[in-house]
Amino acid sequence: MLVYFADLAHDYFKVNQYTPTGIGYITAYSKNKLGDKVDFRLFKSVNKLLDAYENEKPDLVGFSNYTWNAGLSKFAGEFMKKDNPSLPIIMGGPNIRIDKEGIEEFLRITNYVDTYCMFAGEHSVYEIINFLLKQPKNMRTSANLKSHVTNGCYSISNDQLIGNSNYTRPEDLDEIPSPFLTGLMDPFLKDGYYPIVETNRGCPFSCTFCVWGISALNKVLKFSMQRVKEELNYVAKSSFKSSAIVLGDANFGILP
């Protein structure tokens, strides 16, 4: 099974380009569970994504969804859906309302997306891939995915919103393999992308301007200090072209 994950960014000049750490976590988690059953390919460039799509058609495509890449994801997603309407396409990220009315409105407007994964998506995306893996190849379709309920995800099926926000929160973040230590970020580090590293997730505060300020994400969890040190050392040795490390924590310094 071939899966494309895209965290797209404009690349007409090399300024403020960051590693796709988010889809890296999702890939590392599913790859650890499924092994060689799935071939994962990660993309930042829309041109590289579409070139790869023309050369080899995937069984599933996933997009990250942020304010800065919504247009690029729309362009690529609509192109693929027009070319192959049965292609399953999923999306995740904070650029969406979290109430059911907002989710339904988003899915009806963004109709190239079959299933939206809410909050941290490692477990939900693994469940989707595992579901499709169990289907005959001719049943790995958009319609089949949309009719299947995956915890933490929503779809429009038979003109009705289905799904739930039953987010599976990991109790131990170290259960999610590192996208750096597994080598998934190596191509991007080699190209000079700034590495985004997390030391913890979650925030107990409810700031209205922040995507972390919701109850589903208010428990603070941390990666082990040993893992963080290993990641920082790995990045320092591998990032020859970038001069900075970006911390992606919701609230850096909140934990001792």
Give residue ranges: language-model regions:
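Glycine- and acidic-residue-enriched helix-capping/strand-helix junction motifs
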Residues: 12-23
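Short beta-strand segments
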Residues: 4-7, 42, 62-67, 91-92, ...
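Glycine-rich beta-alpha loop elements in corrinoid/cobalamin-binding modules
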Residues: 29-31, 37-167
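Radical SAM [4Fe-4S] cluster-binding motif and immediate context
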Residues: 173-256
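Conserved strand-to-helix beginnings and helix N-cap segments that scaffold or border functional pockets
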Residues: 16, 73-74, 100-103, 222, ...
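Short, glycine/serine-rich, charged loops/turns that create anion-binding
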Residues: 10-12, 96, 251-252
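Nucleotide-activated donor-dependent transferases that construct or modify glycoconjugates
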Residues: 1-14
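Alpha-helical packing segments of well-folded alpha/beta enzyme cores
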Residues: 26, 76, 231-235
